Regions:
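Acidic, Ser/Thr/Gly/Pro-rich low-complexity segments and short DxT(G/T)-type signature motifs
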Residues: 550-557, 617-647
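Aromatic- and carboxylate-enriched substrate-binding clefts and catalytic-loop regions
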Residues: 135-379
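Surface-exposed, short loops/turns at beta-strand junctions within beta-sandwich domains
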Residues: 606-612
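Solvent-exposed beta-strand/loop surfaces of large extracellular or lumenal domains
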Residues: 27, 31-38, 503-529, 587-598
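Disordered, acidic Ser/Thr/Pro-rich linker "stalks" and the adjacent N-terminal cap
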Residues: 432-439, 446-455, 621, 641-669
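Short, surface-exposed alpha-helix to beta-strand junction/turn motifs within ectodomains of secreted
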Residues: 566-594, 619, 633-637
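Active-site-proximal substrate-binding groove within the catalytic cores of carbohydrate-active enzymes
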Residues: 57-58, 62, 291-520, 525, ...
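Carbohydrate-recognition beta-sandwich/jelly-roll modules
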Residues: 1-130
């Protein structure tokens, strides 16, 4: 409801912010302009004692209320200072990347296709230079929702397996006969962590059945009001805590996708939770106090297990209060579909997807005015998977690049990649993804401070994001419409630029240009207070980098290799542009082009002989700030890229220093 989703927000009064550190507090400013912050408990001292909410000497202490002074009465400044306070009490949430199985096979996952997807994704990531994922995640489809005694439905074999639920709780279906052991071991072998989806309310397909299974077993209750599990029942939260602890102990789970909580308060007084209060607030307070205890217990267990990057992602039906960040790392944006499209002039998939989700950001920030850091929003992007999306072969490499980079300027720390490996095989998308993730992580200290500029794209308006950290900035701009439009903004504190930039020169570099037709005068300079007006073509997107420091370092060649008898690949330490002119000694160059991720130059030559050494020279390249790249290097072509081969001990130098053994003898050894 509108009432529940607005709970736990701060109040701004002139140059101050006020609020309660419990995220389910009612905060409002009434018609007389009086601000109220109300915490609803409804508990007797006996109940407080039962729920371990009294001090050791029998006293009750309420949640803390906070008041803070900001540097200005300007709302943007108050918000920035309030977020600084939130950051000081929040659990640490660094830039994070992980792979999730959902849009690959949705609920039809099993041991085999999870193993296949994980292996293919890791291979693609590692071969394109991506650091190990923080987590590989198994989404919904592992739980057994089947029970003939509580449901009259036929077993859904593909999604839930063939057997009945026998424990009366969350349990593995027979598609996962060894639990998460194969998947978690595989993730560990990649140098990554392992993540798990759990739907507290029972998921979204069998929530009623799961609620009845749990109630029949005595581990919780079925909520008839919402047709799902009663997530506030203390028996359920206690049993779920035990289940989570077992998972962390057994599989070192470092990510919990907690998908779906209470949509309405349960009014059944026979359930093990509070009822009553204004709008059922006794229920909501009691529910979230129980879950906060669960979060704290799991974090303590994570420390015991050496899990140093445990992440809680709270998804649907969670009011976006910034005070949840004391325990959780990210919260679903709430006002959006998982995947949505809106067409406002451009009908390409990249345009429809960006216009929809960015429109939801404008609704969240500008219309509803939720005070929640954009860095901690879970937005369900990027999605480029085969199931339920109709996205296969629907993005060119340039569109995929634009999709990722524009999303990056929203500022989120949390990158859960909803990919299918065969779709990332299209074109050069592995390399584009790798370059993007490297850029986003490197610039996260800037991107996380994103502010919206322009107006909502779902009405066809120009818009973008402005991100700043000290003397560095990144600004994105996009025109979603079918006509030429302008975007204007002032480079000042309202878009996040620090006032300390006054009088200083900012060097501007183009990071992305999509559908740009005019010849940009690049490497320009701008200053604080300048009014920036940009003319954008239909569907055009641009991203600028701004800094007081000027880049004067030329691109450096980091790798040169012959990948085939007619192909030479040159890799640079940064993105390069231009039209390469190349020569290869003893061979003709028939084609020279910059790769889609702009980190490589690919040369096609006449046939090279095995073992031949050639000299490669390339000119006509520069980095994004205009520094020229000079390439003059030697490359040796080795057939099938085999440098040396040994088939017997006698083929080796110092053969006496080598011990022959077998795989069996090495088993269990490091």
């Amino acid at each position: 409801s509108g009432y529940v989703i607005s709970l736990g927000q701060p109040v701004y009064i002139q140059g101050m912010f006020l609020g309660c550190e419990f995220p389910m507090t009612e905060t409002e400013i009434d018609s007389n302009k009086n601000a109220h912050m109300r915490y609803f408990s409804g508990k007797t001292f006996e109940k407080l004692q039962e729920d371990n909410q009294l001090t050791t000497d029998g006293k009750y202490v309420t949640w803390q209320t906070v008041a803070g002074a900001a540097r200005s009465t300007d709302m943007n400044v108050i918000q920035s200072d309030f977020y600084e306070y939130i950051n000081s009490i929040a659990t640490r949430s660094d830039f994070r990347t992980q792979y999730n199985s959902w849009y690959d096979n949705m609920m039809t996952i099993n041991d085999d296709n999870i193993e296949s997807a994980f292996k293919k994704m890791e291979k693609g990531f590692s071969e394109s230079g991506v650091e190990p994922m923080d987590s590989y995640v198994v989404d919904d489809g592992w739980n057994n929702y089947n029970n003939s005694n509580t449901t009259s439905t036929v077993h859904d074999v593909a999604r839930c397996g063939t057997t009945d639920n026998v424990t009366g709780f969350w349990e593995f279906n027979n598609k996962f006969p060894n639990g998460f052991r194969p998947a978690s071991d595989l993730a560990e072998s990649f140098g990554s962590g392992f993540g798990v989806w759990v739907g507290p309310r029972g998921g979204y397909n069998y929530n009623a059945a799961m609620g009845k299974i749990i109630e029949k077993a005595g581990f919780g209750a079925y909520n008839a009001v919402t047709d799902d599990i009663d997530v506030g029942d203390r028996r359920y939260v206690t049993k779920l805590t035990e289940f989570f602890l077992q998972m962390q102990d057994a599989y070192k789970v470092n990510y919990w996708k907690l998908d779906g909580f209470a949509t309405k308060p349960c009014t059944n007084a026979n359930h093990k939770h509070m009822t009553g209060g204004k709008n059922g607030m006794y229920y909501f307070s009691d529910t979230w106090e129980a879950w906060i205890d669960l979060f704290e217990t799991l974090r303590t267990n994570a420390e015991k297990n050496g899990i140093d990057n445990l992440w809680f992602n709270l998804t649907c039906y969670v009011n976006p209060s910034p005070w949840y960040l004391q325990w959780a790392n990210s919260i679903w944006i709430q006002n959006s579909q998982d995947i949505g499209r809106v067409q406002v002039g451009q009908n390409r998939q990249v345009d429809q997807l960006l216009s929809y989700r960015d429109g939801r950001y404008f609704d969240f920030v500008k219309e509803r005015e939720f005070q929640f850091p954009l860095a901690n929003i879970y937005n369900h992007d990027p999605i480029y998977g085969k199931t339920g999306t109709n996205l296969a072969n629907q993005m060119t490499d340039d569109e995929f690049k634009t999709y990722l980079y524009m999303m990056g300027t929203r500022g989120t720390a949390f990158w859960e990649l909803y990919y299918s490996p065969e779709m990332i095989d299209e074109g050069q998308k592995w390399d584009i993804n790798a370059e993007y993730l490297e850029w986003a992580k490197k610039n996260y200290h800037i991107l996380k401070n994103a502010k919206l500029i322009g107006t909502t794209p779902d009405k066809g308006n120009t818009y973008g994001y402005s991100c700043w950290d000290g003397e560095e900035g990144i600004i994105s701009m996009r025109n979603p419409s079918a006509s030429v439009k302008t975007l204007s903004f002032t480079l000042d504190r309202n878009v996040g630029a620090a006032e300390s930039l006054k009088g200083k020169t900012l060097n501007r570099t183009t990071i992305l240009d999509h559908k740009t037709t005019d010849a940009q005068t690049d490497y320009q300079t701008v200053k604080y207070g300048d009014v920036i007006t940009v003319t954008l073509q239909p569907g055009e997107a641009r991203i600028w980098s701004l800094s007081t420091a000027k880049d004067t370092k030329a691109p450096q060649l980091t790798l040169a290799k012959a990948t085939a008898d007619n192909t030479i690949e040159l890799t640079f330490d940064e993105r390069v542009t231009g039209t390469p002119a190349a020569t290869v000694s003893g061979a003709n160059v028939t084609k020279a082009e910059v790769s889609a991720n702009q980190r490589k130059v690919m040369l096609t030559t006449s046939t090279l002989s095995a073992g031949s050494k050639v000299t490669v020279s390339v000119s006509g390249l520069k980095d994004l700030t205009g520094n020229a790249a000079a390439v003059n290097t030697e490359v040796v072509y080795q057939e099938n890229q085999v440098v040396a081969k040994a088939s017997a001990k006698t083929d080796l130098k110092n053969a006496n220093d080598v011990t022959e053994t077998t795989d069996e003898a090495l088993a269990g050894k490091t």
